[in-house]
């Protein structure tokens, strides 16, 4: 069980590294496939100097900002939306949950919050205060707390494109803070507005990237779900094994039936609806 769990973690890390490598190849080195399927820049694709970015970018690209490709919806002050008697609460997603997932210390919020601040597996989250982190969420449904943005598409740009663009730009913010020998306190909407990134005029190249990366994201979420199920199984079985209540035979086999990853049809019962935006400016 431990080996299988660590194996899944290793696979997820490798998948993330491979996806990032492909992103860098296409959108940093600009060797995305040209019309003939050859690497654009390496095959002599025309590059144009951009004065704002201070670098050459492919012809037909421009300098834009993160708001052009993504929407940033801030979470709620969840302490103002505690669950009422009889409600089935949602766990609150704070920066701690982004690191550790849900724990016994995780707070709860009413399920009657706007859909825009409900989080589902596969959503992109960006903690913008104190700890600057971007992640593909895979710890289960929850309610988003303030100091974290839920990042969604703007102007039709796909998830994989705005995820890696944001991931790269967070590194820019961190390097700026390091150069000033200070800690970046938080990222505001103004910081995002002032960001500068290279964006293709025709988003078909971003859509082609999405076709390749979307299955990778789906597999990463599935593996994380399995990791969580195995972790829960470990935490609940170890005390039983230690005090002799179960043994590594048929007792354990029967218990395993109760700890499995939900199948696809069960996961589909939870639909990810998008509601009216309730974003709050940072």
Region locations from a protein language model:
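Secondary-structure transition motif
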Residues: 29, 35-36, 74-75, 157, ...
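Proline-centric
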Residues: 1-6, 56, 148-159, 175, ...
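A short beta-sheet element
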Residues: 94-95, 113-172, 177-182, 187-192
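Flexible loop/turn segments at secondary-structure boundaries
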Residues: 100-102, 133-135, 248
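Alpha-helical scaffold segments that mediate packing/assembly in large oligomeric complexes
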Residues: 21-41
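Non-catalytic DNA-recognition/assembly elements of restriction-modification systems
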Residues: 2-25, 44-77, 203-250, 259-282
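Sequence-specific dsDNA recognition surfaces
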Residues: 47-55, 64-82, 89-121, 144, ...
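Short coil/turn segments at secondary-structure boundaries
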Residues: 37, 79-87, 176-179
């Amino acid at each position: 069980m431990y080996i299988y769990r660590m194996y899944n973690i290793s696979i997820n890390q490798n998948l993330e590294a491979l996806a990032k490598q492909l992103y860098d190849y296409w959108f940093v080195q600009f060797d995305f496939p040209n019309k003939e399927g050859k690497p654009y820049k390496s095959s002599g694709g025309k590059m144009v100097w951009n004065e704002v970015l201070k670098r050459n970018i492919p012809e037909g690209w421009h300098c834009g900002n993160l708001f052009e490709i993504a929407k940033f919806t801030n979470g709620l002050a969840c302490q103002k939306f505690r669950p009422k008697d009889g409600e089935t609460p949602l766990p609150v997603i704070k920066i701690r949950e982004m690191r550790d997932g849900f724990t016994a210390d995780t707070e709860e919020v009413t399920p009657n919050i706007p859909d825009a601040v409900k989080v589902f597996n596969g959503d992109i989250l960006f903690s913008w205060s104190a700890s600057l982190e971007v992640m593909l969420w895979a710890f289960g449904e929850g309610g988003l707390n303030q100091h974290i943005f839920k990042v969604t598409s703007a102007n039709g740009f796909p998830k994989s494109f705005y995820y890696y663009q944001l991931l790269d730009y967070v590194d820019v913010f961190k390097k700026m803070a390091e150069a000033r020998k200070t800690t970046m306190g938080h990222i505001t909407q103004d910081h995002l507005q002032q960001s500068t990134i290279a964006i293709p005029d025709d988003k078909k190249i971003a859509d082609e990237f999405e076709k390749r990366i979307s299955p990778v994201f789906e597999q990463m979420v599935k593996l994380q779900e399995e990791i969580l199920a195995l972790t829960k199984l470990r935490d609940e079985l170890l005390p039983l094994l230690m005090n002799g209540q179960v043994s590594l035979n048929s007792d354990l086999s029967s218990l395993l039936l109760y700890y499995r990853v939900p199948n696809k049809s069960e996961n589909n019962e939870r639909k990810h609806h998008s509601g009216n935006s309730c974003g709050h400016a940072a």
